[in-house]
Amino acid sequence: MGEFNEYDDIDDFFCNDISPLHDEADEFGSTDIALPSQLYGKGPKPRAGESKALRDRNKESGSGTESEAKGDTLATKRGRSSWRRGASESSRSSSLGSSSPSDSSSGRSLSPVRPAKRKRTDEQQPESEANRFLAEMERDIELSAGPGGGETATGKGGRDTDARVYNVGFISRIEGSRNRRVNVKVTGQKQFATFLAIALAAFSKQHNIRKSLKPKYQADQVKIYREGVEVFKFMTCDSFNIEEPYNASATDIEVYIVPVDEATAFEQEWKRKFEERVRMLSNSSFLEVMDDIEDDNDDFLVNEYEKALVNARSLNETELAVREGTPADESSQLLKIVLLGSDNKKVFIHVRPTTTLLKVAEHYRVAKELPPTVQLSLMFDHEEIDLDDTICNIDIEDGDIIEVVVK
């Protein structure tokens, strides 16, 4: 009996389809079915009534049939294993054969594609460099817009355009720090939005603003004005196109911080004061210079356009006197004097020698926004002076200080 195989049961199940075996006694042949008992070497039980000789003959024929069946079974197994190996080899060969043309065809088809990919990479390289350059520019702008940033940008002639320095004087119109001043030194390319918050924080800290008023000291709750014109927060000091000083010193700029809800009233007030100032220039002999602003540097000069008007007016009067054949009047000379109030705040004005002290007192009343019911008296050299006198009668010189007493 052959060795036991775990796949014999499976083979026994498929062994019903065995090719017919020809017997010499049967010329037509007979189909033998390989039973499991024959494959495992177990013969059928003898039937009753069979003789011993018949059983021996059947046994001999059964052993022959069993050996032939075993041979057929082994041949069938070998055929199947060889067929499986052949099928696997043929499948591998077919797969290799089918892949080789595809590989070759794909290789041929990819050969023009690979240079195209490299070409696209080459085309994208300048674009990435451009994007990198733009990103660096944006980063430089953000750094220059920051509180301590500021990358130098080269202008015409290779000169640094942001090297110009400005002293920005913020004058507050906000409750809690009204008419107070904070100076901020910045470069010309910084936007007002970047250092406005610094000025507001300085006002709040310096004057101990109470908690209920601190919401008014936010950048979105105020507007900026320069000479009555609103300054947008994205603007810079260079946007004003102010002529640079000949010695390249810092340029002084004066702006007002006004609450949003008071902006309209401030514009109307500024317009009224400007019209009054023009009327005073045309009808009187003195010029308003400063407002009631507290500053460490009280000797702050007047606006450039007002000084230009004064100089032009004096020149015209002198030329008119020369044309008429008369000498130029000495009264056309302007003197700069200082009005000092009890609050130690200075108001600068330009007067002529023929200007009366009453007009000087009225100018102080307008500058301080005092009501008409308030009485004013002027003191010079610790003596009260008559308001009907003129500047030349009291021997007031350029730069003298006149004290103002409010009664």
From Swiss-Prot:
Signal peptide (from-to): none
Keyword Isomerase: no
Top-level lineage group: Eukaryota
Bias (Low complexity) ranges: 84-111
SUMO-like region repeat copies, ranges: 129-253, 334-407
Keyword Nucleus attributed: yes
InterPro entries, sorted: Rad60/SUMO-like_dom (IPR022617), Ubiquitin-like_dom (IPR000626), Ubiquitin-like_domsf (IPR029071)
Domain notes: The 2 SUMO-like regions, although related to ubiquitin domains lack the conserved acceptor Gly residue in position 456.
Function of the protein: May be a substrate targeting component of a cullin-RING-based E3 ubiquitin-protein ligase complex RTT101(MMS1-ESC2). Involved in HMR and telomere silencing via the recruitment or stabilizing of the SIR (silent information regulators) complex.
Name recorded for this polypeptide: Protein ESC2
The species this protein was found in: Eremothecium gossypii (strain ATCC 10895 / CBS 109.51 / FGSC 9923 / NRRL Y-1056)
